[in-house]
Amino acid sequence: MPDGTPIIQLIERGFSGIGYEIVDDVKKYAKVDASDYGVPQNRERLIILGIRKDVCDDVQSILHKFYLEILPKYKSKKKTTVAEAIGDLPKILPIIDSKDLKSRIGYSEPSCRTTWHKARRHSLRDVEIYQMLANDIKSGRNEYVDSKSLSDLYEEKVGAKSPIHRYHVLRADEPSTTIISHLDRDGNRFIHYDPEQGRDITPREAARIQSFDDDFDFIGNQTDTYIMIGNAVPPLLAKCVGLAVSEVLDIL
């Protein structure tokens, strides 16, 4: 904050000001990774539980029990991978009808009833980059897996320098990187692992990686949908936290 007060202290003051107590070491106890709870993505967030100070004598013991015993009971036995989450969705293939690298390339329409599984258009240049990078991972060559090689590739292909690397292929056999609200602008960092498809992930694929069921629809345009999905708390994580909080209420 501008006055130098750590965010954690402000959070503690905020809870205390309305009569609630939170765990004594938020950084140590409250950080949770959604991938531990069945969500196919690495997504670290703080889950802060507040208990009213006047409802029991030893709030800290209950808070410690919540983080160390109750919530961990709902962890999954194994982590869910990207391929397990989206691998059964129909392929969406690029329709390349031009050799102009700047031309916008469309994609085949998937034959499925699932909503929002539709690719956005990309330039031929980007399609070729996506295919090359996905094939680099799939083949095991791994020439473009570090920041420098990816930044150099961006400069070579786009003709501009970037302080950060702009490309990332989702690994089929691992959880995804964190789904973000500005995915509609940062699709280069969410490239589909299948080289044949040459694209970033669709809204439905992003929703599945957030653990939404396919019957969950999103109202709005594609940009609105990416934002809603990226800002959401993964439903599977929310369910686990809710069940754990329910146990705390039973104790109280």
Per-range role (PLM):
Residues 100-252:
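C-terminal target-recognition/interaction regions appended to catalytic cores
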Residues 1-154:
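Class I S-adenosyl-L-methionine
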